[in-house]
Amino acid sequence: MKKLLVLLLFFSIMPFSLFACGVEPSPEAPTESENRSEEEKSDPTSDLPAINDVSVPERSGSFKAVVLGDSIARGYGLESPESMRYSALMAESLGAFYETVDISNYGVDGRTGVELLEFLKTDPPKEINDCDCVIISIGGNNILQMLDTAQTAFNALMELDPKAVADYFKYAVAPEGEEKDKLAYACDAISSVFGAVNAAFESETFNSLITDAGKRLEEEIPLIVAEIRKLNPNAKIYFQTVYNPYKGMNVSLKEVDEQLKLDDYGERSVACLNAPIEALSEELGYEVVPVWTEFDESGKDLVNAGISLLPFDISVDPHPNWQGHELIAKIYCDIITEVK
């Protein structure tokens, strides 16, 4: 069965979706400075996404950026984060436009908005002082309190019996009779699991936590921006929206009473986080980077989460795969080169 793309943070994010965060520790110092050598820059060919689909002008000047944020920024789950995450891909692509490109990455797994604010107050990256722009990926981990609720839902999903799934498809094509009656249990088994997942995400506790996470982010964004402005009043600030890692992960099966609605829950959750990101941009003078919209509209497999019922396979990891990082890099490069 065709793989369905999926969902909350959420963020940075977590071992599970926007709900959980990566568990690998990351240092509070840049894990890289993405400078391309002159030899590397001399080769114009690249598998990286095309930028703006226009002729590349002669390289000139320099570009310096600082990336702040969570596990998405750090590249959690990639085989080689230092070379495959979107900041590294940006450095590679922007090398066709600038003589020197320097991107310092301070992404940390599980980092929340309040933790980023504390980092900027107590140990700000020195690179911010003279950088051209600051790139922020934050918000998903603000819903860490939802971990118990999300874990309950995902545990229920993981308990879906592969044999019941296989028997369901046998049931769907079996002729009426004794054999079909024996397989009918599969409909109830799948419906029960889907119902348990839905109940967790539809609970009052879950919805309250989503709302609170959005309110906290609304309070934190002005403080984060203010700290960056203290360090560098002239730096351009880019704040990326949170994508829905469970896009396409609604599942409806004939004669199964419950529909699995992870896409719906994911969309509702990220909307609460993206609302303040978008609403405050004009007032605070930062640019919103539409990662949420671009992921929704791409139609590609951009995250690790997904469901395949035949063969049976489920992943709820919300982090971008390499293609996801490629798309994020392209979004930034298009914006940056447009104003060059």
Language model regions located:
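Serine-esterase "nucleophile elbow" of acetyl-processing enzymes
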Residues: 39-109, 124-128
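Bacterial N-terminal signal peptides
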Residues: 8-17
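Structural recognition of the beta-strand scaffold that forms the well-ordered cores
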Residues: 64-69, 73, 102-107, 132-137, ...
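Oxyanion-hole/transition-state-stabilizing segment in secreted/luminal serine hydrolases
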Residues: 115-212, 244-245
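Active-site segments of SGNH/GDSL-like serine hydrolases
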Residues: 188-208, 222-267
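Positively charged n-region of N-terminal signal peptides that target proteins for export
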Residues: 1-4
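Bacterial lipoprotein signal-peptidase II cleavage site
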Residues: 18-29
